[in-house]
Amino acid sequence: MKKVLFPCQICGQNSHGTHFGIVSCRACAAFFRRSVNSKWARKGCLTNFKDKGSCFCKPCRLRKCVEIGMDASKFQYDRDAISAIKHPKIFPSVSYYVGRPEFLMFSDSNVTSQKTFIDVQNLVFEVSRYLDHGCETPIYAENQLKKLTLGFKLMQFDYQNVKFFDKIGKAEFIDIIEYYFLTVAKWIAHFDEFRKLDQSLQIKLLQAIWHVWSKIHKCASTAFYRKSNPNAKPTQKILRNVCMDRMHVHKLDTSWMSDYPTEHVTRFMLTHHVYDFKIVESLLKLDPTDVELTFMFAQLCFEYAGKRFQGEILKITDHFQQVLSNDLHHYYITDQRRERYFQRLTDLMKVNNLIQRSIWETRPHRELGRVFEISKLEFSHPEMFDDSGFC
C-alpha cells in the first residue's frame, strides 16, 4: 500500500505528521517552537515582497504558522524517560536522624559547664534609691531637652586625663556594667516626664535602655577622642571613659564568661560591633552639638524601648519623643536660627538607625551563642541584658 504524504501547510514540503495542531514538516515545527517567543514575533517583514504569501523570511514564516493554527499551548515538556541531569541520591546522615550536629553528637547533653552568676540586685537597689532622691542639684533650663543636655555635659569624656586598659577581666566587665547603668539613671533623672512615672516603670525602662545608651556613648566618646587627639589610632575605643586599644591589651581573660578559647570569644563579641567604625566616622563628619547629641541619645533609647515592649510603654516613649522633638525644633529655630534643618536631622537619624540596625542584625548571632553555650554567664536580672551582647 502506497503511503500518502500530505504537504506541509507552512512551506509545502513533505509533512511529518501533525505538530502543534496542524500538518507540518519537522523543520517548520521546530522553527515555531523556538521562535514563538523570540524577537521575530515582534518584527515585521524583512523583505520588500509585495506577495506576502510567497515571502518566507522569519517574521512572515512565524506569522503564517500562527495564522494557519499552530498553538503554543500544545508544547510538551519533560518527556524524557531518563533525566539528562543525574541527581545522585544522598542518604540521610546519622546527625539528621539524631537531630544534632556531628561535632555535638557524642557529647553528653546533660553535662553543663559551671555557670558564672552575676548578681546585680544591689545595683538595681542603688538606682532605685537614687531615683527616690532625684538629682543631686536643682536643674534650671528652659525646656526638657536642655535639662537632659545639662545631665549629659556632666558625664562627658575627659580627654585630657585619659586612662588605658592594660588588662580586661571579670572585674573590668562588671565595672563597665555598673558605670553605665548608674550613669544612665543619673542622666535620665534630669527628664521631668520620666520622673512622673511609677518607679517600677522607671526601672523597667532603665533595664531596657542602659546598654543602648552605652553603645552610642562609646561611639560618641571615641569620635570625640579622635577629634581632640590627632594621634589616636583606629583600634582605640572609649569604654567607661577609659581607652582600650585592642592591639595592646596585654591580658584579656574570658575564662570566667566562657569555656571557649579567648580568640573565639573575642571574635564572637566583635560581631556585635560591626558597624561601630562607620558610626564613629559619621559622628566625626556630622560633629553634632551637645543638644543634638542629647536628642540622639534619647531618641535612640526611647525608640528601642517602645519597639521592644509595645503597649503602654510604646505610648509613653512616643510621648517622650514628641516632647523632645518640639524642644529640638525650638532649638533649631530660636538658638541656631536655622529654619531649614530637615537634612541635618535626617543625617543625625541615619546614625541612630545604623545603631538600631546593628542591634537587630546581631540577634541571630546571640541566638547561636545561646545554642552553643558560648557564654556561661547567668544574671539575677536576665531581662536587663537582652540585646546587650553579654548573654
From Swiss-Prot:
Give any GO molecular function from the UniProt entry.
RNA polymerase II cis-regulatory region sequence-specific DNA binding
What subcellular locations does the record give? Nucleus
Which InterPro entries does the entry link to? C.elegans_Orphan_NR, HNF4-like_DBD, NHR-like_dom_sf, Nucl_hrmn_rcpt_lig-bd, Znf_hrmn_rcpt, Znf_NHR/GATA
- A GO BP entry: innate immune response
GO CC terms: nucleus
Q: Which family does it belong to?
A: Belongs to the nuclear hormone receptor family.
Gene3D superfamilies referenced in this protein's UniProt entry, alphabetically: Erythroid Transcription Factor GATA-1, subunit A, Retinoid X Receptor
Q: Which keywords does this Swiss-Prot/TrEMBL entry list?
A: DNA-binding, Metal-binding, Nucleus, Receptor, Transcription, Transcription regulation, Zinc, Zinc-finger
- Which residue ranges carry the DNA-binding annotation? 5-77
Which intervals hold domain NR LBD? 130-388
Q: Which SMART domains match?
A: HOLI, ZnF_C4
Say what the protein does. Orphan nuclear receptor.
Residue spans crossing the bilayer: none
Q: Which residue pairs form cystines in this protein?
A: none
Zinc fingers, NR C4-type, are found at 8-28, 41-65
What protein is this chain from?
A: Nuclear hormone receptor family member nhr-115
Where, if anywhere, are coiled coils annotated? none
